[in-house]
Amino acid sequence: MKQYIPIESVFAREILDSRGNPTVEVEVIAEGGFIGRASVPSGASTGAFEAVELRDENSGRYMGKGVETAVDNVNNTIAPEVEGMNVFDQVAVDKLMIDLDGTPNKERLGANAILGVSLAVAKAAAEALGLGLYQYIGGVNAKTLPVPMMNIINGGKHADNSVNIQEFMIMPVGAENFKEALRMCAEVFHNLKKVLHSKGLSTAVGDEGGFAPNLETDEQAIQVILEAVEKAGYKPGNDFRIAIDAAATEMYQEDGSYFFWKSNIRKSKEEMVDYWADLAGKYPIISLEDGVSEEDWEGWKLLTERLGSKIQLVGDDLFVTNTKRLEKGIKQGVANSILIKVNQIGTLTETLDAIQMANRAGYTAVTSHRSGETEDATIADIAVATNSGQIKTGAPSRTDRVAKYNQLLRIEEELGEVAEFPGLKAWYNLK
């Protein structure tokens, strides 16, 4: 017999995200008083192919960034259609909202409106069954805790400093479990603060909790991180690997070259590939995200041919959590991993479809936050539900980031002996 609990009410409100910008929060109540609440994140460096985040564009309110239109779309357009539907029928609810919107990129109702409802429905359903969200989405096989990909030095569009590359991250591949992984990362983070301080560099933190010092070169960021790893008593390569998010789309020029605007250096796509290969040869780098632009398919092919069997090549702007873009990438043999951001596509169903497609093609999936976050920790549950093996959700600083890590600690505790921490096995597709 199919279990049926109707959705009684859907309500949205405008709240603030971690950058002080408005975002959408949705509450779904199912019969019996089961409540699901979800809030929607927002990115600073966004891919051109992402689903549309609806903003009011009213300059007299929140400098044009209000989301009252999206909130109204939930309360007046989506709610009347979704109320009465089965809270367990996630696919049907998501499909109804996609059809209601009727555009390929959700620009009519807004991906921020649709996603808020989608996630809140899943949370209400989990609540009704008395399950953790990760168990509801992932079932009995949801047991893999992700290796954190922790952003501890920021540059690019995320920081007003001299560093062109957007994110330098640490990955505690030598940890035995998630709890230990988190401790190791926190210790490196605090040691990095000491290293930067000793060099007279800034220790103020950016949007994602990482430091944003003015460095002489981008490469120096890797060097100070490795110094901090050693100071914390760990071994680079064994205990920690480095991950980089280049956000190269931000550097891409109309003539097909790449401009490192903070240091006034221009590189061809071939030189970009050489640059990454050189860094990957010198340092214990395991992952490179958006090493070339979302538009540069030829550059992606060169990069994948050169480094695709050695390190993880993550498509973020390239794939935008979109199965059509991912399918094209798989057919062309570019990248070997996809970054998963729920708000790039706008529903839980489409997010899970993208992860499934990636896994079937032998691509890894990295569950990710956005630079504008809230206290909502849904992505922690999604990472475990899908056994994705990796999560990117900022430094161990700022509650909007730490909320996700703390939720993963709770999940690991709840899973007990069943919990698995993959370490280097997360990169099953590398030689």
From Swiss-Prot:
The protein's location, in the record's own words, is:
Cytoplasm; Secreted; Cell surface
Q: Which Gene3D superfamilies match?
A: Enolase-like C-terminal domain, Enolase-like, N-terminal domain
* Residues annotated as binding Mg(2+): 245, 289, 316
A GO molecular function term, named singly, is:
magnesium ion binding
Q: How is the cofactor bound?
A: Binds a second Mg(2+) ion via substrate during catalysis.
**Ligand binding ((2R)-2-phosphoglycerate):** 166, 341, 370-371, 392
User: Keyword annotations for this protein?
Assistant: Cytoplasm, Glycolysis, Lyase, Magnesium, Metal-binding, Secreted
PROSITE patterns attached here?
Answer: ENOLASE
Catalytic residues, per the record, are 208 (proton donor), 341 (proton acceptor)
Classification via InterPro entries: Enolase, Enolase-like_C_sf, Enolase-like_N, Enolase_C, Enolase_CS, Enolase_N
Biochemical pathway: Carbohydrate degradation; glycolysis; pyruvate from D-glyceraldehyde 3-phosphate: step 4/5
The cofactors it requires, by name, are:
Mg(2+)
Disulfide linkage: none
Q: Which SUPFAM superfamilies match?
A: Enolase C-terminal domain-like (SSF51604), Enolase N-terminal domain-like (SSF54826)
Reactions accelerated catalytically: (2R)-2-phosphoglycerate = phosphoenolpyruvate + H2O
By its UniProt entry, which Pfam families does this protein fall under?
Enolase_C, Enolase_N
Which family does the UniProt entry place this protein in? Belongs to the enolase family.
Q: Which PANTHER family match?
A: ENOLASE (PTHR11902:SF1)
This one is known as: Enolase
Q: What is the lineage of its organism?
A: Bacteria, Bacillati, Bacillota, Clostridia, Eubacteriales
Q: Which gene encodes it?
A: eno
